């Protein structure tokens, strides 16, 4: 009997580990997170609390190994930082298993099903507030290949996606555990089915709904170059920028209205900035298209990671400085201003790369009327899908279109529903470009108006459920 229980325990742990390994990380399979916690949750009530925690901890830790190469060898985090990150995430999952187990052992499958997503969203929200990387690693990004699911973000923000996924997982685990009376399990099936089906129906409806919009033709362009060129003398930077300006003239199709170039195409001093501005003002006038250029502006006392906007008539109309810099990697000074450009098709906003990991900034832009976000970026190749989709989800949350050009990444054009309209990967040593049309429309979402109300609801509900659990103990 003991050997049978041990085999069941190991099988449950390995099943959850495998599902989380392939369902999270840089290239997730969207349906796997819906099932990943189920085996562990289903068996948890039959185990002692210590065993249930260790099972959840081990399963999630093994699943997180899908990020090891990225963390250790691509972004080269210190080993102790990686271990701390992986262990904390596994502890959070293990505690979530214990939280659900406490309700299952008291015969409350409905509360157990609610407890898991409520706990998870509360933890994700606290992490997003406290972490310098905000929503990086959020469960919601695993769902970017399932467009109906992510539409709920226009109401709840990113938090509603995580909730729906783990509500299904929690309910399935509770049902398989056998906890509760038959009528309770029947009510649970009906309630969760209604909620999950409603979210899919809403998503399908939103994808099919349309509003009067204006099409904008956008060209995205980038060239991957060695780090030695970026860190090299200013002459090399100016040469590369000149090549970009020539490529803009050559490759932008007639009728292009906006051209987005990547983040940090070069580092230039104040004395050379006028030359760069003249170069791209001329290119903008020649193509009759607005140009967004990402550069590092170096002053005697500081440097700024900037995005500069040149209008179709060749004028420098805006300079945006990146708000959210990567700790320990970007030494530049953070900006704090929004830049919005009123154009014939609507109001365009500027952000840079990591800025779009932070929901609040995009929500502020949307509240100010932005309907197209122009985003220079710089990724690490292996994370190109994930980081582009994080930005796409900001567009879904807030009802704006997105044009994102990432060196060492993807050139991505998406609409305000998250549909990818044009996309291609960059390549080393040569220019790559893609052109597409995107409909832009002023469409303020419920999430834009109300903010993180759903996350706060989950935090409040978690406090109530935790107090109830402590009182019952």
Q: Which residues fall in each region the model found?
A:
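Short, solvent-exposed cationic patches
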Residues: 335-349, 370, 375, 437-458
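Membrane-embedded alpha-helical bundles of multi-pass enzymes
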Residues: 2-207, 381, 394, 411-417, ...
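Short, conserved active-site loops that position catalytic residues or coordinate cofactors/metal ions
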Residues: 24-40, 63-68, 222-223, 255-268, ...
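CN hydrolase (nitrilase-like) catalytic-core segments centered on the catalytic cysteine
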Residues: 75, 117-118, 258, 265-266, ...
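Active-site catalytic loop in hydrolytic enzyme cores
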Residues: 71-81, 107, 126-156, 282-285, ...
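Generic structural signal for well-ordered alpha-helices
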Residues: 96, 100, 245-249, 338, ...
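Soluble catalytic regions of membrane-associated enzymes that act on cell-envelope
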Residues: 203-331, 341-344, 350, 354
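Conserved beta-strand and immediately adjacent loop positions that scaffold enzyme active sites
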Residues: 217, 306, 337, 410, ...
């Amino acid at each position: 009997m003991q050997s049978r229980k041990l085999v069941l325990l190991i099988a449950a742990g390995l099943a959850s580990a495998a599902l989380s390994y392939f369902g999270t990380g840089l290239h997730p399979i969207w349906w796997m997170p819906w099932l990943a916690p189920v085996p562990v949750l289903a068996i948890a009530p039959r185990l002692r609390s210590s065993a249930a925690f260790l099972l959840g901890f081990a399963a999630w830790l093994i699943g997180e190994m899908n990020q090891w190469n990225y963390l250790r060898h691509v972004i080269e985090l210190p080993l102790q930082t990686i271990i701390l990150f992986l262990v904390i995430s596994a502890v959070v999952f293990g505690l979530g298993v214990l939280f659900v187990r406490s309700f299952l052992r008291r015969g409350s499958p409905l509360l157990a099903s609610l407890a898991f997503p409520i706990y998870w969203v509360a933890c994700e929200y606290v992490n997003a507030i406290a972490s310098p990387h905000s929503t990086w690693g959020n469960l919601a990004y695993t769902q970017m290949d399932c467009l109906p699911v992510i539409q709920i973000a226009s109401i709840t923000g990113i938090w509603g996606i995580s909730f729906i996924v783990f509500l299904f997982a929690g309910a399935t685990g509770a049902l398989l555990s056998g906890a509760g009376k038959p009528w309770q399990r029947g009510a649970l099936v009906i309630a969760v089915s209604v909620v999950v089906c409603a979210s899919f129906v809403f998503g399908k409806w939103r994808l099919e709904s349309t509003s009067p919009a204006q099409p904008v033709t956008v060209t995205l362009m980038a060239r991957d170059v060695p780090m030695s060129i970026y860190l090299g003398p200013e002459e090399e930077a100016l040469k590369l920028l000149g090549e970009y300006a020539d490529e803009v003239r050559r490759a932008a199709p007639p009728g292009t209205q906006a051209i987005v170039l990547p983040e940090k195409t070069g580092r230039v001093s104040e004395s050379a900035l006028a030359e760069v501005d003249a170069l791209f003002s001329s290119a903008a006038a020649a193509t009759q298209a607005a140009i967004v250029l990402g550069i590092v502006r170096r002053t005697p006392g500081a440097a700024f990671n900037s995005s500069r906007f040149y209008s179709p008539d060749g004028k420098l109309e805006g300079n945006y400085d990146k708000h959210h810099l990567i700790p320990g990697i970007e030494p530049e000074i953070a900006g704090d201003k929004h830049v919005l450009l009123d154009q014939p098709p609507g109001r365009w906003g500027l952000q840079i790369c990591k800025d779009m990991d932070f929901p609040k900034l995009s929500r502020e832009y949307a509240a100010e009327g932005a309907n197209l976000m122009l985003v220079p970026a710089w990724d690490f190749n292996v994370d190109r899908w994930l980081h582009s989709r994080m930005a796409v989800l900001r567009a879904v949350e807030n009802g704006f279109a997105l044009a994102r050009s990432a060196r060492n990444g993807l050139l991505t054009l998406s609409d305000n529903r998250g549909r990818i309209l044009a996309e291609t990967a960059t390549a080393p040593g040569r220019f790559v470009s893609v052109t597409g049309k995107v409909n832009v429309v002023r469409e303020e979402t419920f999430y834009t108006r109300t903010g993180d109300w759903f996350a706060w609801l989950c935090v409040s509900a978690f406090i109530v459920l935790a107090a109830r659990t402590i009182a019952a103990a």
